[in-house]
């Protein structure tokens, strides 16, 4: 990708693309591996820091290329350790990246678009509409920024980022080429060396692109389902009017069958009080998914202003989970993380919170967590 400076941004180039770039400037293809390792393993954005690259080539790179990531606007840390970065992309829009630590695993939730065109009724990102696709550099740049923030390199066993999920702002399959390029860099040993099983793309159901995805890359697939019948899903996830459930699940099964290796589909289901959390919805879901190798992730709704929806009670959540368990499914309930910094699922809107209000909220939540911890010890 050529930036506003007229130079090629090397950050978003896959290894084959980097090889082509070096050939285009009269250099050997092996230089791609050297430079790619500097960029992604060590977070370098200055060609002069590349000590195994000769001075003449470094000067040529300065003339034709640059390494430019998104601009960090703010970083917040939740009381539970969740981190959220707000970054500004070339279009001027802001997007959000969220890091969720849990046990020995660290999951980075990456955005693919500024805003979203799908307008799912329970998601705050969709309420702002679509602004722009992110370039491959802006997608992988979120991993690059987070990795640098933690001061780790991919070769380390104890690296902070072990999993990446394309579940941030936007519909990844509507920014297909750039997202695929970024995921290839994530999995490349010269990039971040993340296992294909630990890179997950989440889609609301762009059926033709699910089939195309299976032809070009091997990553885990998650489906944002949220309703067990077409009538309700048409209302909650409007793209269902174009690609109804029968068509959508057929595409998901085709994708999973291509992967083999006992891979399964992750089904995401946001629970909305008195909307999709009733026993009949669980029974419909069991019937809908009976022929689909899958695990189900229930997501209690994370409130945001003017959404019109509420989070179900804990009893309602447990009841729904138990019914699915009895139906033979592996079911987990996602623990809400980062809601004190608006980093929970469905809350990403690319806004920068007022610093004073942000600090007050963080302190209040931290104090609450500390008091609850002390009470539990007593």
UniProtKB/Swiss-Prot annotation:
The active site is at residues 96, 345. Residues 102-342 form the Radical SAM core domain. S-adenosyl-L-methionine binds at residues 170-171, 202, 224-226, 302. [4Fe-4S] cluster binds at residues 116, 120, 123. SUPFAM superfamilies: Radical SAM enzymes (SSF102114). Pfam families: Radical_SAM, RlmN_N. The keyword Amino-acid biosynthesis does not apply. It is found in: Cytoplasm. It comes from the Bacteria. One of its GO terms (cellular component) is cytoplasm. It is an enzyme of class 2 (transferase). Coiled coil: none annotated. It catalyses: adenosine(2503) in 23S rRNA + 2 reduced [2Fe-2S]-[ferredoxin] + 2 S-adenosyl-L-methionine = 2-methyladenosine(2503) in 23S rRNA + 5'-deoxyadenosine + L-methionine + 2 oxidized [2Fe-2S]-[ferredoxin] + S-adenosyl-L-homocysteine; adenosine(37) in tRNA + 2 reduced [2Fe-2S]-[ferredoxin] + 2 S-adenosyl-L-methionine = 2-methyladenosine(37) in tRNA + 5'-deoxyadenosine + L-methionine + 2 oxidized [2Fe-2S]-[ferredoxin] + S-adenosyl-L-homocysteine. Binds 1 [4Fe-4S] cluster. The cluster is coordinated with 3 cysteines and an exchangeable S-adenosyl-L-methionine. Its main location: cytoplasm. Its cofactor is [4Fe-4S] cluster. GO terms for biological process: rRNA base methylation; tRNA methylation. Its EC number is 2.1.1.192. The keyword Magnesium does not apply. Disulfide bonds join 109-345. Belongs to the radical SAM superfamily. RlmN family. Specifically methylates position 2 of adenine 2503 in 23S rRNA and position 2 of adenine 37 in tRNAs. m2A2503 modification seems to play a crucial role in the proofreading step occurring at the peptidyl transferase center and thus would serve to optimize ribosomal fidelity. Reaction proceeds by a ping-pong mechanism involving intermediate methylation of a conserved cysteine residue. This is Dual-specificity RNA methyltransferase RlmN. It comes from Pseudomonas paraeruginosa (strain DSM 24068 / PA7) (Pseudomonas aeruginosa (strain PA7)). The gene is rlmN.
């Amino acid at each position: 990708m050529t930036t506003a400076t007229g130079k090629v941004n090397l950050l978003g180039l896959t290894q084959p693309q980097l090889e082509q770039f070096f050939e285009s400037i009269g250099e050997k293809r092996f230089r791609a591996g050297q430079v790619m390792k500097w960029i992604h393993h060590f977070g370098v954005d200055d060609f002069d820091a590349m000590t195994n690259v000769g001075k003449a080539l470094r000067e040529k790179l300065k003339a034709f290329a640059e390494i430019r990531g998104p601009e960090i606007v703010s970083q917040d840390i939740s009381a539970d350790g969740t981190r959220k970065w707000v970054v500004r992309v070339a279009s001027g829009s802001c997007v959000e990246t969220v890091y969720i630590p849990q046990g020995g695993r660290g999951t980075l939730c990456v955005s693919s678009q500024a805003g979203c065109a799908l307008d799912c009724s329970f998601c705050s990102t969709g309420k702002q509409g679509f602004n722009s696709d992110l370039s491959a550099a802006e997608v992988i740049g979120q991993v690059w920024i987070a990795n640098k923030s933690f001061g780790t390199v991919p070769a380390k066993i104890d690296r902070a980022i072990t999993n990446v999920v394309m579940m941030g702002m936007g519909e990844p399959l509507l920014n297909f080429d750039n997202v695929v390029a970024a995921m290839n860099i994530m999995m490349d040993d010269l990039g971040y060396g993340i296992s294909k099983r630990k890179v997950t793309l989440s889609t609301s159901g762009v059926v033709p692109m699910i089939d195309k995805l299976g032809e070009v890359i091997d990553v885990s697939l998650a489906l944002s389902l949220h309703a067990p019948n077409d009538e309700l899903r048409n209302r909650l996830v409007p793209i269902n009017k174009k690609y109804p459930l029968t068509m959508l699940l057929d595409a998901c099964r085709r994708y999973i069958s291509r992967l083999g290796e006992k891979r399964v589909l992750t089904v995401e289901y946001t629970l909305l009080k008195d909307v999709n959390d009733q026993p009949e919805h669980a029974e419909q879901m069991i019937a809908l998914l009976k022929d689909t190798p899958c695990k189900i992730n229930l997501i209690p709704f994370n409130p945001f202003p003017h959404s019109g929806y509420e989070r179900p009670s804990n009893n309602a959540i447990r009841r729904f989970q138990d019914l699915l368990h009895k139906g033979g499914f592996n079911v987990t309930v996602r623990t809400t993380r980062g809601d004190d910094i608006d980093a929970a699922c469905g809350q990403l809107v690319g806004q920068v919170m007022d610093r004073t209000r942000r600090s007050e909220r963080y302190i209040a939540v931290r104090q609450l967590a500390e008091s609850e911890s002390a009470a539990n010890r007593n």
